[in-house]
């Protein structure tokens, strides 16, 4: 699909007209694990579905287009995407990253550092990242916004500085999606997502994606993914394509809802701080009395107390015991992820119901 089209058009028409044999408008679901060769020495382009599958290939085509990238690979989960991205870097690489990041990423970073595979340096602010880039760095890895403190970073500035030092730049774009941010355009070498979240958008798909503009990186990534086999299944590829079609509409609605909810939270006597970037559906906030958090979570009727984010349903998460439980308390507290923080993923419900639910739980 042409990247010259506007992103809303690319999304709405994701995967259409891909079946030349029948003219089917919707991308077919190809379950076959193997493909017949027309003749000896000939291939249709598909041989074994771990290597390449028609449905997955169509999903990857759309994912590359919306991220302004030339290449995309769909993986079996967001963590599989992170592991795949790091598979192209030599053992012993020095990685500079942010302290505030997804707990699963921290858990894996911590494990591979113990094994001696990579060495990590953590920074709390953009200024600290810039200062650390004066040192020997092989990889700059950032989330922006970060999870869950919602810190934003200037990708273009950091990429320019990193590249001047010969470092590669990897960006996790899960929170914003390509609707609000396309890091490839700002100089990132690799961009990844937990496609489970906003891209698929319905809490029924486990998926990841890695995109790049570099043929050299793509060939390494493709080889490693084919070898390890953590590919996205045909069915999940089909579901992902379907979810992508409404991405821009969902992001627009969740952002509109989030802005109204932020306005409410900022006036609530039960809330002492709200963390929101002004766009997207992710909000974090700190309560006045953290002892009331169990009551708040148990009192909600419209919000679901659950991990994950980016679906059409609104969720509330307590990072201390859920997404960031593997990060030691003293580490979390040192950079501001304290036990009084709750995270919201705002869905597409009527915002009046969402605000009413929060009000009765926070102030009741």
Model-derived features with residue positions:
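Conserved PLP-enzyme active-site core in the AAT-like
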Residues: 2, 11-13, 72-270, 275
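Conserved N-terminal alpha-helix of the aminotransferase class I/II PLP-enzyme fold
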Residues: 34-83, 87-88, 104-111
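Conserved small-domain helix->loop->beta segment predominantly found in fold-type I
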Residues: 259-313, 327-329, 333, 359
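Short, well-ordered beta-strand elements within core beta-sheets of diverse protein domains
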Residues: 242-249, 281-288, 343-347
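N-terminal "arm"/small-domain region of PLP-dependent enzymes with the aminotransferase-like
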Residues: 1-53, 61-62
